[in-house]
Structure formats: structure tokens, C-alpha cells
Amino acid sequence: MNICNKPSNKTAPEKSVWTAPSQDSGPSPELQGQRSRRNGWSWPPHPLQIVAWLLYLFFAVIGFGVLVPLLPHHWVPAGYACMGAIFAGHLVVHLTAVSIDPADANVRDKSYSGPLPIFNRSQHAHVIEDLHCNLCDVDVSARSKHCSACNKCVCGFDHHCKWLNNCVGERNYRLFLHSVASALLGVLLLVLVATYVFVEFFVNPMRLRTNQHFEVLKNHTDVWFVFLPAAPVETQAPAILALAALLILLGLLSTALLGHLLCFHIYLMWHKLTTYEYIVQHRPAQEAKETHKELESCPRKVRSIQEMEFYMRTFSHVRPEPSGQARTAALNANPSQFLATQGQVEPPLPSSSDTLALPPRIQPQKKRKRRVYRLPRSGVLDRELPLPRLRETGTPSRRSSSSSDSTSASPVHAGGSAGAYYSASAESMEEIPVAQTRLGSAALGAPGARGRESGLALQARSPAVFVSPSSGEPGTPGGGDGLP
């Protein structure tokens, strides 16, 4: 099964080879071991093998029986010789490649009479382990692979050719290449002959009637002969055209397939690779593409559910940004907890199980922004507390001067001890401008400074400014007026 809950399209190995029987019951008939195939003549034949034989017969019959005899008289011997040599050579190498047993030497020495044992994955992880095949029960070479179609180890395994119905290995690889090359050359030559006949039929049909059997039919141009000169058979002109056109179409298709196959194996030989090694190297990329296609082929509803589950797992730790009202309520309810959590308000839990947070793809979240909340000027700072009175030990003039200085300065609210002061930045001491008097007492700056102060972000408690007792009173040694 794949990610879309669909069965995989990959072809699994044959059940009779790879499925281990149950330990409780004996092997069922469908789980009996498969016999090894010796070569391409072993039963059963593959459908593509039969198609290859039929195409060879069709090309040979139409080429030698219909098209070559219609060539000009002086071209006929060359046509028979060239096409005959190519077709005969292809037949020899093709039959040889089919008949050769490409199995490993140790496998060929073993008898093919009985079926091989069934592979049990509970006992072995791979068919070939430490250069020993667990199915063939022989030691094999490092380049040998076990073919599931032939059920045997092939030395220098390249691929299993369905057209030959045989494995292609070190023993028959060159024969396979010669078979492909000769087939391509023969089909190309046959397509050229068929094209010439098809064109000359409309341009100058008399050039196709040079055989002596056409001399008695000079006045009957619609009558043609096939299978000349051994067994002439009369036919009509449309039959000649249909056969030539059909051969051209099949020939072009065969040329494309054979040419592609030959170029591919030339590429493999240049890079010193086998078909099996090439497939293994490109398998990860192909599987990734197949997985992407399977995900795209999923129904939209199934894909949206899977994406929702993914985003819910991925973004479950993200807490939404609290609104301004929630932050204000949390500030008024518990200022210490609000400061400890850096201003984050825990969202309320859903009242029912039906309330789910949708993924960003369904309900997009806005980008969180830092909000600055301003307290009104009539708040904490406007509440004035009386400053502690200093000890009066001086003259009346100095007492009046001290009182005038005290009244001229704006009162500062002492919020508590110095340990209770909290700040979120290193420049917190500069957030509120403080004017120092002659006695060292603190006062707020000018009205312009108070205007700028109202635009700054404040915490739950205003910072406290303490007047040091060492400042003293007027006239004392620690006081500001005692300086010379």
C-alpha cells in the first residue's frame, strides 16, 4: 500500500519463488518450487518471443516474395544477396543467443531435473549471501545474480530479454548485440526497398514490371504478380500498395525500437555498466518521482486530511498571539504572572473535542507583531505620594530654601524596594528622564519629557527612584549646601 491507500503498481517476484510456506501446514500446490529454465526454448514461450518470430517471417516473406522481385532487373541479384546475407546472419545469431544457457558454471554443472526449494525470508535476508545462492545451493561468482524469471543464477547478469525468452549474461551478451544490430540493419534495408516500390508505383510503374512474366500483360497494368519467379501469383495493384505501406509502417516502428535499444547498450558499454547496474543506480530517483506522482494522484479530500494531520502535528506547539483585551485583563488580574510569562497569555482550552485548530493552509495565521500598550497619563504616575520629610537642623533661610526646592520638584512615586524593579532592556534607566535637584532628589523632567514618556512601553509597576539618606539636609556635612 502507498501513501494514498492504493495498492502499489510495482511487480513483486513470483509467489512460487519468494513466498515461504507455513510452518504448520505443508506446502500447498501453488507454493511448490519452480523449475529452472535452461534457455529460451524452455517452456513456456513468452508472447513477445512469438511476436518477434512472426515479424521476422512477415518481413522475410514480403521482402523476398513481393518487393525484391519488383526491383529493376539488374538490381534483383544484389537485393537477394544483401538481404539474404543480413537475414541469414540475424537468424543465426538470434537462434544462438536463444539456445545458449547463460547460467553460472556451478549452476550448469548441477542437475536441472527437480524444482528448486522455496525461498524463506525468515531464514535468509537475501537470495545470494556471501557468494552462495540459497536457492541454487551453489557458490556463484561476484557478478552473478539470481533471475526470478529463469529461477537460476546468471553469470554477469545484464537483463532478462523477453524477445529472446532468455537471460542475457556474459555468455550470450555479444550474441544479443549482434542480433539487435543485424535486425536493425535488415529492417532499414527492407524499408528502403519498400519505399522505392511505393514511390515508383505512382511515378513510373513500368520500372517495376521488368520481369519476364509481365511481358504477356503489357495491356493489363492492373494485374501484378507476387512470389516471382518461383511461384507467380496474380494480384491487384491495391494489394501491392497495401503490403508496401504496411511494411514501411512496421519497419519504421521496429527501427525506432531497435535503434533505441542499440544506442542504450552502446552507452552502457561506454560506461562499463550492465542494465541491472544502471537500473539499481537510478532506482532512488525513480522511486521519489513515483511517490510524488502517487501523492498528486490522491483524491483531494484524502490529500487535505493528510496535510491537516501533518500541520497539526507540526504546529501544535505554536501559541496564538493574545489580543489586546486579553493582555490587559491578564495585567489587571495578576501582574506578577504577566511579567513572569513575558506578556504571553495562555489561550483557553477548547470546551469540546470538536474544536480543532485548523492548519495554516486552511486557516492562515497573520504574522505576529509586537504590540506596545500605553497606560493613560492619569494612571500610576499621576498619583502623587508625599516625599519623606528631611530633618530640619538648619536656619530658617535654609529651611525655606529647602522647602522651595522640594515643592519645585515633581513628586516621584516610590514603587518598592530596589529588588522589585523589573526591566526588559538594558536601557531601562533611561526610559524615564529624571532631573536631579541640589539635594540629590529625583524629579521628572520638563513637560516635553513627560510627553515623550507617555509613548514608551511601561511594565505593571513603575520604576522606583530612591533618595539616598546620605544626601543629608541643608547644613549637614553630607548635604549638598555644605560644599564650599
Curated annotation (Swiss-Prot):
It is a multi-pass membrane protein. GO terms for molecular function: palmitoyltransferase activity; protein-cysteine S-palmitoyltransferase activity. Residues 475-484 have a biased composition (Gly residues). Residues 1-38, 341-415, 444-484 are annotated as: Disordered. It catalyses: L-cysteinyl-[protein] + hexadecanoyl-CoA = S-hexadecanoyl-L-cysteinyl-[protein] + CoA. The chain crosses the membrane at residues 50-70, 75-95, 183-203, 239-259. The active site is at C161 (s-palmitoyl cysteine intermediate). Interacts with STING1; ZDHHC1 constitutively interacts with STING1 and in presence of DNA viruses activates it by promoting its cGAMP-induced oligomerization and the recruitment of downstream signaling components. This is Palmitoyltransferase ZDHHC1. It comes from Mus musculus (Mouse). The lineage of its organism: Eukaryota, Metazoa, Chordata, Craniata, Vertebrata.
